[in-house]
Amino acid sequence: MSKITKLFKSSGGSGSSSKNRKGPSAQEALFKLRETEEMLTKKQEYLEKKIELELATAKKHGTKNKRAALQALKKKKRLEKQLAQIDGTLSTIEFQREALENSHTNTEVLKNMGYAAKAMKAAHENMDLEKIDDLMQDIHEQQDVAQEISDAISRPVGFGDEFDEDELLEELEELEQEDLNSQMANVNLPSVPSSKLPSTKLPSRPASSRKKVEDDDDMQMLAAWAT
């Protein structure tokens, strides 16, 4: 067997083993990403302190030692470049971590929904739609029977069923009319005098006085009729 054949066989075997091997879980990947974020955050804080230190060095030397001041500023620029790269890397890792967290959340949600669907299916396996319809029909019938029983119990027995209310009202009106006619018949009107009174001419009264006398006479007649 040649070395080339052995190489292809070994590579094929490693390929099959790599296919059988599963990738990292979502929890493992998230753990690694958080570790990387923590490491880069510490590096970020270190670079920020170094930049402040180099800036202070450049200010310290100023015009007195331009060479040292320029050297400090060059270091500061290199550190700022590294800091910018770390900021970009952190943004990428943060985006990847959030996407992985969302993917893991969606996976768990779908898994739980699948469990719920299976449980619902298992619960409905022993249910027959025809039996459910029959059961609901029986329930409605029993509710109707219960309502009829309640109506029968709450209905008064022996009161109001054998009498017509309209006839009773008509009879009551007749009684009231008879009572009113009896009262009108018993009214004592004043008797008319049989002898003629002497025709003495009374002085004429003013129109207002005659009107007042007529009103008083009407009131007296009305009072006598009422008694």
Swiss-Prot record:
The keyword Membrane applies. GO terms for biological process: late endosome to vacuole transport via multivesicular body sorting pathway; midbody abscission; mitotic cytokinesis checkpoint signaling; negative regulation of cytokinesis; protein transport; vesicle budding from membrane. Residues 1-27, 178-227 are annotated as: Disordered. The keyword Secreted does not apply. InterPro entries: Snf7_fam. GO terms for cellular component: cytoplasmic side of plasma membrane; cytosol; ESCRT III complex; late endosome membrane; multivesicular body. It is a peripheral membrane protein. Residues 32-94, 129-187 form a coiled coil. Keywords: Coiled coil, Cytoplasm, Endosome, Membrane, Protein transport, Transport. It is found in: Cytoplasm, Cytosol; Late endosome membrane. Residues 189-206 have a biased composition (Low complexity). Gene3D superfamilies: 6.10.250.1710, ESAT-6-like. It holds the Pfam family Snf7. Probable core component of the endosomal sorting required for transport complex III (ESCRT-III). ESCRT-III components are thought to multimerize to form a flat lattice on the perimeter membrane of the endosome. Probable core component of the endosomal sorting required for transport complex III (ESCRT-III) which is involved in multivesicular bodies (MVBs) formation and sorting of endosomal cargo proteins into MVBs. MVBs contain intraluminal vesicles (ILVs) that are generated by invagination and scission from the limiting membrane of the endosome and mostly are delivered to lysosomes enabling degradation of membrane proteins, such as stimulated growth factor receptors, lysosomal enzymes and lipids. Belongs to the SNF7 family. This is Charged multivesicular body protein 4c. The gene is chmp4c.
